[in-house]
Regions:
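Glycine-rich phosphate- or other oxyanion-binding loops that anchor nucleotides, phosphorylated ligands
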Residues: 1-79, 87, 91-94, 104-108, ...
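Short amphipathic alpha-helical/adjacent loop interface patches that line ligand
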Residues: 97
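Short, conserved interaction/coordination micro-motifs, predominantly
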Residues: 100
Length: 150
């Protein structure tokens, strides 16, 4: 998935940096200069506010997931880039939406019809409760996501 997205991003004209560490912070807000320096010292490459939850939920739903992190600004550690201005972020965000659409259009053409990755069975060992002790109501509510394990 990641390789296909990287190829599609390059094909859409994006500058691509495969890999990296994503730091999820509480938002909506911009980092202070001290926070920004701390995140850099930890080795964070991208700072955002939503990706952690999305990645966890995708794993729990056994959905293949990869991040396309389209930067809107340099965090405030980069003194030469100046302070982050909301108007600039909104403009770049708008451009990034169009770029993301091109990337996704290019990527979906190359996805295999069947998956053979571990994502499809990520929950196979997650249920510890004896199956007989799982109430009918809970089974019904969870059927869509974990029905194959019940």
């Amino acid at each position: 998935l990641c390789e296909g997205l990287a190829r599609a991003a390059q094909g859409a004209g994006a500058q691509v940096h495969p890999g990296g560490t994503y730091l999820c912070m509480e938002g909506p807000q911009f980092s202070t200069r001290a926070e920004s320096e701390l995140y850099r010292s930890w080795g964070a490459h991208v700072i955002g506010m939503t990706n952690l939850q999305e990645a966890k939920l995708a794993r729990e739903a056994e959905i293949c997931f990869a991040t396309i992190a389209l930067a809107t600004d340099y965090d405030c550690w980069n003194h030469s880039a100046g302070d982050v201005e909301i108007e600039q972020v909104i403009k770049v965000l708008s451009d990034n939406v169009k770029l993301a659409q091109r990337i996704i259009r290019g990527a979906v053409r190359h996805f295999p019809p069947e998956r053979s990755c571990a994502c499809a069975t990520a929950l196979k060992d997650a249920i510890i409760t004896e199956r007989a002790k799982i109430p009918k109501k809970a089974r019904k509510e969870l059927k869509l996501i974990i029905g194959k394990y019940l």
